[in-house]
A protein has these predicted regions:
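Secretory targeting signals
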Residues: 1, 7-9, 13-26, 64-126
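Terminal transmembrane helical anchor/hairpin motif
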Residues: 1-14, 135-202
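Hydrophobic alpha-helical transmembrane segments of multi-pass membrane transport/permease proteins
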Residues: 1-2, 22-30, 132-139
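Long, hydrophobic alpha-helical segments
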Residues: 18-41
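Hydrophobic/aromatic residues in alpha-helical transmembrane segments
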Residues: 31-35, 83, 114-115, 191
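Helix-loop-helix units of permease transmembrane domains in multi-pass membrane transporters
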Residues: 38-68
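Transmembrane helix-loop junction
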Residues: 41, 85-89, 121, 145, ...
Length: 202
């Protein structure tokens, strides 16, 4: 069946391009705002001393806050998926494409959330943490746009959007998954190291 734009592109692809692409842009702005208070509020309210002296490890503190962010984003993405899946009552959907888009968006936001947690641990001012997170996330998302074509292939390996784009096209490469996992792990470990240094120095 041909004729309308959605039918030509495929209903699932048409919706994914509209919904998930828009969601990725919105969450690029929202995630820094959500994560900027995770640690900075602890500094400002002077509860960090009590938190670090509690009978839990720094790793548990950071992972708890980070997993809370992941669960929040997972809930938002799940809501989007449910809304799209409701259309399966009337149209045929490509569930594989839907799942790869959802996974790609979750991995993208997981990386930005880890970055936000790290910058939140650097300052007691939430606005500064949010700004640094947004600036850094935007740089990693758009980094491939800033370089000439002869270096673009190399630079694209560091672009979050380049890796996310494969998921958006329904392609799930192990390299893309590993990139996002290493990206998030790096910033989580840096946050733990930051708190460890602070605890040692008092």
């Amino acid at each position: 069946m041909r004729g309308s734009l959605p039918e030509q592109m495929g209903m699932t692809q048409f919706m994914c391009e509209g919904i998930f692409d828009t969601a990725s842009i919105l969450l690029l702005f929202m995630t820094p705002l959500i994560s900027m208070r995770l640690m900075s509020d602890e500094y400002r309210s002077q509860t960090m001393t009590f938190l670090t002296s509690a009978p839990i490890t720094l790793k548990e503190i950071i992972l708890g806050k980070y997993l809370a962010l992941i669960l929040y984003h997972s809930f938002l993405i799940a809501v989007m998926l449910v809304m799209i899946l409701m259309l399966s009552l009337w149209v045929e959907l490509d569930y594989g494409l839907l799942l790869t888009n959802a996974l790609g968006l979750l991995l993208l936001m997981s990386g930005i959330a880890a970055m936000g947690l790290f910058f939140s641990s650097q300052t007691q001012y939430a606005v500064i943490a949010g700004f640094l997170t947004f600036l850094s996330a935007s740089s990693f998302v758009l980094i491939e746009k800033f370089y000439a074509d002869n270096t673009q292939n190399f630079i694209s390996h560091f672009s979050m959007m380049s890796h996310y784009r494969n998921f958006a096209h329904g392609l799930m490469h192990s390299f893309d998954v590993v990139f996002f996992m290493l990206f998030a792990t790096f910033f989580v470990l840096m946050t733990i190291h930051r708190l460890h240094i602070q605890r040692v120095n008092g």
